[in-house]
Amino acid sequence: PALCEAACTCGDVTGSSVTVRENEHAIIETAYAKGWLHAAPPPSRTGKSIAVVGSGPSGLSVAEYLNKRGHAVTVFERADRVGGLLMYGIPNMKLDKSVIERRIKIMQAEGVEFRTNMDVGGAVAAEELLNGYDAVVLCCGAKKARDLNVPGRDANGVHFAVDYLTSVTRSLLDS
């Protein structure tokens, strides 16, 4: 259930809370199934170019809104797939990867360019972006997990959550 469902006051009257998550899911899935959602490129372009570093939730949001304003947007992602934490940090049982992939396809059709395997600050110099774009937006995720100084932390089989989820998801996507 969505976080608000536990505190929903409709339950006081009807006996159950409003199933917000399920309602929203049904609406969006119906819209996709019936073809109501389609690419809507901006009517005009500003001539400005923006580099977005990172394709996680914030990077995708920034890219979408800047593109809608008419800017040419290029998203740089260090991983081999777009989506950041959405793609690698959330298990498929919670967020099916096809949901992310279909949204990316719409964004591409609207004019957003995605470049994967592009490690900005590594193989791609930051100066290259600063010189090649009118603006650069940093939406990079935390690559290094925070370690805990607790007994057993270094035991066999103890992993950082995002590292573990990334490994499992990558193996599923590559199979």
Specify the residue positions occupied by each region the protein language model found.
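Ferredoxin-like iron-sulfur electron-transfer modules
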Residues: P1-L3, W36-V53, S58, M87-Y88, ...
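Redox-cofactor binding/interface segments in oxidoreductases and associated redox assembly factors
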Residues: L138-C139, F160
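Glycine-rich dinucleotide-binding loop and its adjacent helix/turn
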Residues: I27-S44, K105-D119, A145-S175
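Rossmann-like dinucleotide/flavin-binding elements
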Residues: A51-F76, R115-A125, L130, K144-D147, ...
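Glycine-rich FAD pyrophosphate-binding loop
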Residues: H71-M87
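Residue-level preference for short coil/turn positions at secondary-structure junctions
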Residues: T46-K48, N131, D154
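N-terminal Rossmann-like dinucleotide/flavin-binding domain of flavoprotein oxidoreductases
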Residues: L3, N23, L86-D134
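Iron-sulfur (Fe-S) cluster-binding segments and ferredoxin-like electron-carrier domains
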Residues: A2-T30
